[in-house]
Amino acid sequence: KFVAGADTGKKVAVIGGGPAGMAGAYQLRRKGHAVTVFDDNKHLGGMMYYGIPGYRIPRDKLESENQRIVDMGVELRMETRIGRDVSVADLESEYDAILWAVGCQSGRGLFVEGWEETSNCVSGVAFLKAFNEGRMKVTADKVVCVGGGDTSIDVVSVARRLGHIEHTNPTDRPELVVRDGYVAHDAAVT
């Protein structure tokens, strides 16, 4: 069990309930500061919850670790967007400090002109977030994934679990492509 430090009388707003925000909340509570975490999402965890499939990071483990921090006396304001539901001016007047821990949630698009206007083309991050929120609507019979990093591999794994990948070439596996001691998954190979 985590233990909060002696009360300092200071209040800190933490914007973002992902790994950085929760680590910040933990450290601030250890120092004795009152902490309120604001997050736009329904669940804590940020990209660990919404960007990585649950079969890779079990939700019960993620939630129990976050709960250990909350149990230190962290107040939560979930489904609250700064700028829409609460103004920055309100935060500045109510709190002694603000920790911005909003993470990297946007993903990258294709380097192809006009891809944004394509109705069936989404970023890997948007695809995984829709899957993790339970609002996945795949209307195509096939999914094409451009890329070979961690996010791309998660997208392909989810698509395969959803039944949209029927055939893969046995040699198209990153662990089979090794150059200079690195697999293709670890480093770009040119």
Placement of each model-derived feature along the sequence:
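Fe-S ferredoxin-like electron-transfer domains
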Residues: 1-36, 40-43, 48-55, 66, ...
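Rossmann-like dinucleotide/flavin-binding elements
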Residues: 11-38, 77-87, 92, 106-108, ...
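Flavin (primarily FAD) binding-site architecture
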Residues: 101-117, 121-122
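Conserved hydrophobic/aromatic pocket- or pore-lining residues that grip, position, or stack substrates
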Residues: 39, 69, 99, 121, ...
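Short, structured coil segments at secondary-structure junctions
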Residues: 72, 116-117, 185
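N-terminal Rossmann-like dinucleotide/flavin-binding domain of flavoprotein oxidoreductases
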Residues: 47-96, 111
